[in-house]
Amino acid sequence: MEIIMGKTYRDIVTGFEGICTGVVEWMYCCQQYSLQPRSDVVSKKEKPSLFYAKQLELVDDGISDKVEAPTIAPPVFFGKECVDKVTGVHGMCVGRAISLFCCSQYILEIQPEDHDKWSRYEWLDEGRVVAAENPTREIDPQEVKGDRPGSGFPPEFALS
């Protein structure tokens, strides 16, 4: 099933309902959709949660009559060494977040020089990211694609 931002979906496992306001996709073929629940209390913002498309069923048109879903372009930077135009930081583009209401962000993984330390992740607005002119390393996303959706999804990126 194609998930369309702005529509309301229900998780078939938990019954959680919300409007799809974004998608996080990773280079290794994992996509999770962000559902923002409606609050019963005026001015209270509930926390969004992430779900896989196979977990979701369409409930209604949500706010799709008020907000047009963005056109999602191919992820041109996946697997490429990229540079943040603002800070000059280099990293491998491993994912992106696409929002219903604002610009997309690419996710760069910055590998520390000491490989015993954890990698750092930078979420950067798409306008800040450019491919490195002389990359030291690149990888075809097909080389790291998992057999099943969700392979390798880092738990620290969960929104709930």
Stretches found by the model and what they are:
Residues 41-72, 113-160:
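Intrinsically disordered, low-complexity, charged/polar segments
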Residues 2-4, 8-55, 72, 81, ...:
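Basic/aromatic-rich interaction segments and small domains that mediate binding to polyanionic partners
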